[in-house]
Structures are given as C-alpha cells and as structure tokens.
Amino acid sequence: MTSIALFGAGGKMGHRLTRNLKGSRFEVRHVEVSEAGRARLAQDFGFTCVPAEEALAGAEVAILAVPDTHIGKVAQSVLHLLKPGMMVVVLDAAAPFAGHLPARPDLTYFVTHPCHPPIFNDETDPEAKKDRFGGVAAKQHIVSALMQGPEEHYALGEEVARTIWAPVMRSHRVSVEQMALLEPGLSETVVASLLDVMREAMDEVVARGVPAEAARDFLLGHMNILGAVIFKEQPGVFSDACNKAIQFGKPALMRDDWKKVFEPEEIAASIRRIT
C-alpha cells in the first residue's frame, strides 16, 4: 500500500482531499497545524493528525494542500525529512512556476489541478448538478505535470490526482509552463475578468430600469446558447445582427493588445502577485 503524507489536511482543500482519499488504496497520514482543522478532521472523519516527522516516515508521497503563499515555507520546513525518490504533489502551478520548491533533484515534483465540472455536461443526479467545484459528485477533467523526476513516476502521480479529484473524466498531461498559461492566464486573468465585466453589465442594465430578475435570466440564458455555439458544443451560427454587434462590441470593450497577458513576463508577473 502506498503511503501519503497529507499536509494541510484540515484546511478547505485538504478536507476535500481527505474525503476522497478515505477508502482508497492509499494509506494517508494527516498533518494539520491548526487546532480547528484537527478538530474538524476528527469530527468529520474520525482521523487523528500526526506530526510531520511521523507522517513522512516511510511515506512515498507528500501532498502539500496549503495556500500558494505557504508552499515554499512548508516544503522547506520538511525538506530534511523527504527521502530521495519521494514524490511531492502540489495542487497549483503558481508556486512551482515561481521557483518556490526547494532545489532537490532527487525528489519528484508532480503538479495537478482540476478543470472543474464543465458547463456543458450530462449530469442528471441533483447532487452532481449542485457540485460546481467538483471532487464530490460531478465529473470533471484534470491537468497534471511531471515537473521533475523519473518518467515512470507519472503513473503514480496521475493515480493520486484521479483519486483526489474524483470523479474524473479526461486526464490531460501538460507542462508546468502550460498549466500557468491555463491558470492564472486563461481561467483567472481572462475568464474571471470577463465574467466580472458581464456581471457589471447586468448591474448596469438593471440600473437603467430593467428588472433585476429579468436581466439575470436573460443574461444566463444567452450565455448558455451563445457559449454552446462559440465553443462548438452544438452546430449553429449567429444571426447577422449578433455578428455585427460582436464586430463593433469587441473594439469597444477590449484593448488591441489584450493577448499580451499570455506573454511569459506577464504570466510571471501575475504569479508573483499571488505567491
């Protein structure tokens, strides 16, 4: 049985991972520094946390389920306890991309992140429909990267990833650099920003007299069909009027050079701000 030391087990993400690892083939040792987190694990799962030294003794994998800003500090604090050949799993590309992981060529660094349940899905179970984050009942895709380490370690890393993010559909292999393009680049800098603009636009039409419920229903419904056509979820074309609105709308909303947010220096700057 493969042993895993789970750091941050009582935090928000660690709690999710604890639930999915319970009952798996992995033997999990839980590490949590906060009293509230330890109490939560004991109450919800009946687990008792152990010191880092005990958790890492004989463990083959260490999962750092801690905030991006703490990854480097936590990794450095247990560096002397990590035996050669051990796998360290990180749940976001930011800290690895920023160089916050210790320089230990004898360790395997594996990075994995969920895509979250897609907007277009075939879920019918009410619990799955409500699981918008993923990892509980709704199926989702994931991305993973073998940052360093033997190629044969990828299979174990992917098995861990499929377990902690279950239920999983497609598992995509990417590089850490590609994962940084996906987040924060694509998902946060672009998508979250544009969604925030959409919310502001909805608030604006409400301020101009449209009933709030009508504005929300109209926006979300149009997001569904427009998104289905744009992302080729279903065949179809926009009306001439819609295409004309896009032609004149994009220049009014977007800078000509907006794609520079994907340039390496911009991605690096974005990651520095969050780590």
Where are these regions (language model features)?
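Rossmann-fold dinucleotide-binding core
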Residues: L91-E183
